[in-house]
Amino acid sequence: MGRLIVVSNRVATPTETKGSAGGLAVGVFGALKDTGGVWFGWSGDVVSETVANAGPTLEQDGAVTFATVGLTRKDYDQYYRGFSNATLWPVFHYRNDLARYERDEYAGYRRVNAWLAHKLVKLLQPDDIIWAHDYHLLPFAEALRAEGVTNRIGFFLHIPFPSPQILINIPPHEELVKSLCCYDLIGFQTDTDQLAFHDYIERHARGTVKPGGNVEAFGRKLRTGVYRIGVFPDEIAEQAKRYESRQHVMDLKQSLEGRKLIMSVDRLDYSKGLVERFRAFEQLLERSPEWRGNVTLVQIAPPTRADVSTYQHIRQDLEYEAGRINGRYSGLDYTPIRYLNQRYDRWKLMSLFRESQIGFVTPLHDGMNLVAKEYVAAQNPDDPGVLVLSMFAGAAAELTGSLIVNPHDSVGMCEALQRALSMPVDERQRRYEMNMAALRKNDLGVWRDTYLRDLRAVPLMKAAPNGAHGTGAGASRKTQDGAPDDAPAAS
């Protein structure tokens, strides 16, 4: 069995893959340890052109090599802040109103993908399989093919794939999808995402979709599939129970003074429906006066992309809403909303989930939402909390024991909170058991192993007539001065 090569925008360091690492890092690292391999991507550092060209930096942990490169300021601005997060992220989350398109940012996005491919080629061996992750790397396989790589290359999209009517708002949409079709296997989180991609192929790419998720488009044959990412529920349950007697939990219980607790944890992002959530909680306090002083919402929302104006605005909006609602409903000994704009250790969060009566997870659009799955897994089986979950989270299709809501309906969310707060223990246990059965059936290991099994089953590409192959020997395209034309832009 060949090595696994994982490529992602950011690489979790060896330290980060242990301890409190998130589900994806744990799952990917587990697969890498099984076969040996490389985790390749951006280090998170913005560096000079000289330092960027000198990479990748290699760090070894057993049979796993962590290979990272830095980005120049221009590449960071165009590839990451620009096209990835100012164009693709909003459009793929159905927020065309927040998207912008700049040709130079799109050019930078493609340039960085080509440069990353050029860096990776030197690390490849003939029987490696390559697994790229997420929207930052849509053209990455095309860039590898241009380098002569014939290895199996798979792609998994962690965020939603938008309907064709939304996607075509990006001017180079056809070029992007054509690049995406250079992968051998494209994995989606949900049936809806896969169907949206198939719809685009048939309507706009003049391609065909055949049984089994097989696609023919742009002169390529590829496979598509639905692979619902999961968690390791029993591990989470064990850790949540272990942490429930820690001081931070005792402090929270003491401060609540017997009040019910609603927990929400999200990155500070407009796709998460945070303002709508606060307004639904306000509806609860307004429509059910008996809950005033008797229930607290804790919203943990660590900052993300703080240098992007859209994210600065959502932070301001959320702070305003929290202040307004607290100003209206607080008492001398009661604050309805505790809004924390900071990061918490993952295992601390699991123990807080276990302490709460409701998990309130209501994104406007989300690929899967692992917080919803972690909330369920962290519960006490004898006295579980209730998950109130958006119908637009990918997890809603699996977690049918949840109270499913429309995040645009504040009254409907309020009614779900009322129901959850009053739900008898036998119903809560029944719903918890339904959700846990789903988590165990399709845990993180199943997601990982099923995807990699399908990728390994894809037929290998035939080598190009010039003998180029997947060993890393494919020649880089050169400019007249002899430098690769995909070298990083100067800072």
Question: Which functions belong to the PLM regions below?
Answer:
Residues M1-S491:
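Catalytic cores of carbohydrate-active enzymes across secretory and cytosolic contexts
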